[in-house]
């Protein structure tokens, strides 16, 4: 983590519970990010916090540190039952819930507090088995949480800490009624510590904070610019016919260590995946059609470096905490201006630099003016030589769709260390 991303404030300066401080030190966390430096003094004194911060600013560690400290510093409800968690962390997507749970593991191991995870689409019985043994902190998505609550597998009557992550995204996905349903089953707002984090503190988010929090303090960490000053942005204007060849040429020239390629539809993502897989790249595909177990496996492989490239729809544009993404390619310019910001925000995180490359083709170039108006700046344009683009590329792989599942049967062969591409040449 770059020191330029951190403040002079140290975790050890706070009166944190010794077990929490020990866990942070073991993970190498010494100095706070701006959102941590602003939020922790409030939460450690028992004040509710509504924080505005983009992903990659350290907000997850801010609310996890606060949650673990509070539970270790305050006794559980005396007549608490085994199906009553003490803290609830709500996330808009299963990927984000899994990531939060993973980030909390180090704190859990050092403190002895038990973690639970609840998300839809997969693992119902496995998740339930953990819950039945009793958990202190439950991370989940609203649909699965409501399912378990209605069947009395969980009871929210002993909640002492509640966190709502990416509150604006909750609204976008239509989950606000679910959130209110869950809040109604918790103790009163003044009997729990409440934290809310959002990329924007819009009127509707502030309204939710007013309803469900106890005189929350608002803290805001604005990026120096919406797209991040550490991200180098670049724009090309390819024809539809040259778009794929340009992408593959740029990948060969940049040779990114870890990159995400975004397209606007699942069919376009499948097409991009097919071309890159056929060309020998280690590439994974992440769309809404990919089964949950496979989604998690692909994300794990990408995070561990077993895959170099992830092709994704906007399902992966927000909430995923994947470190060291060096490049983001917008194969399609998004229709939503905010999606552009969230896409390229996958790189240049935690003080690192990043590179964003967008292809403004004939189909989506009309989206560019709105994006540049929203970000407040023009994206630098680069030119390319059509004669220098790669040619003689192999025919794309097609997705095998076995009975009962979708998505590729396996990821492509390793990109590095494989057979040489003797038939590769540039046109012209």
Swiss-Prot record:
Keywords: ATP-binding, Cytoplasm, Helicase, Hydrolase, Nucleotide-binding, RNA-binding. Residues 392-428 are annotated as: Disordered. ATP binds at residues 53-60. It catalyses: ATP + H2O = ADP + phosphate + H(+). It is an enzyme of class 3 (hydrolase). It is found in: Cytoplasm. Transmembrane segments: none annotated. One of its GO terms (molecular function) is ATP hydrolysis activity. Residues 245-390 form the Helicase C-terminal domain. It comes from the Bacteria. A motif (DEAD box) lies at residues 165-168. Residues 40-219 form the Helicase ATP-binding domain. One of its GO terms (biological process) is RNA catabolic process. One of its GO terms (cellular component) is cytosol. It holds the Pfam family Helicase_C. Its main location: cytoplasm. NCBIfam families: PRK04837.1. DEAD-box RNA helicase involved in RNA degradation. Has RNA-dependent ATPase activity and unwinds double-stranded RNA. Belongs to the DEAD box helicase family. RhlB subfamily. This is ATP-dependent RNA helicase RhlB. It comes from Serratia proteamaculans (strain 568). The lineage of its organism: Bacteria, Pseudomonadati, Pseudomonadota, Gammaproteobacteria, Enterobacterales.
């Amino acid at each position: 983590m770059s020191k330029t991303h951190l403040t002079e404030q140290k975790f050890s300066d706070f009166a944190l519970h010794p077990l929490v401080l020990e866990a942070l030190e073991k993970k190498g966390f010494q100095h706070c990010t701006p959102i941590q430096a602003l939020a922790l003094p409030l939460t450690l004194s028992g004040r509710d916090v509504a924080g505005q911060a983009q992903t990659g600013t350290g907000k997850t560690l801010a609310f996890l540190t606060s949650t673990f400290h509070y539970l270790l510093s305050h006794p559980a409800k005396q007549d608490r039952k085994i199906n009553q968690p003490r803290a609830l962390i709500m996330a808009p997507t299963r990927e984000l819930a899994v990531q939060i749970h993973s980030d909390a593991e180090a704190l859990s191991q050092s403190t002895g507090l038990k973690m639970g995870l609840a998300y839809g689409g997969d693992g119902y019985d496995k998740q339930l088995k953990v819950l039945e043994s009793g958990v202190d902190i439950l991370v989940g998505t609203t649909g699965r949480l409501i399912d378990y609550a209605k069947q009395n597998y969980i009871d929210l009557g002993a909640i002492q800490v509640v966190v709502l992550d990416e509150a604006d995204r909750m609204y976008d996905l239509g989950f606000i009624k679910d959130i209110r349903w869950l809040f109604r089953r918790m103790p009163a707002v003044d009997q729990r510590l409440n934290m809310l984090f959002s990329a924007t503190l819009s009127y509707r988010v502030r309204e939710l904070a007013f309803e469900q929090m106890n005189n929350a303090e608002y803290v805001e960490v604005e990026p120096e610019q919406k797209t991040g000053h550490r991200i180098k942005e670049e724009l090309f204007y390819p024809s539809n016919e040259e778009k794929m060849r340009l992408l593959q040429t740029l990948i060969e020239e940049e040779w990114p260590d870890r990159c995400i390629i975004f397209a606007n539809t699942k069919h376009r993502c499948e097409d991009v995946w097919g071309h890159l897989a056929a060309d020998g790249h280690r590439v994974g595909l992440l769309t809404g059609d990919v089964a949950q177990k496979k989604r998690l496996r692909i994300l794990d492989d990408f995070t561990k470096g077993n895959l170099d490239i992830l092709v994704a729809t906007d399902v992966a544009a927000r909430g995923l905490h994947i470190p060291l993404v060096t490049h983001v390619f917008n194969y399609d310019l998004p229709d939503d201006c905010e999606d552009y910001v969230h896409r390229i925000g996958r790189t240049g995180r935690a003080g690192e630099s990043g590179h964003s490359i967008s292809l403004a083709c004939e189909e989506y170039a009309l989206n560019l003016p709105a994006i540049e108006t929203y970000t407040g700046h023009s994206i630098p344009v680069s030119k390319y030589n059509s004669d220098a683009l790669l040619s003689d590329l192999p025919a794309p792989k097609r997705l095998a769709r076995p009975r009962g599942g979708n998505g590729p049967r396996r990821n492509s062969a390793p990109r590095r260390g494989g057979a040489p591409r003797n038939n590769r040449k540039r046109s012209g």
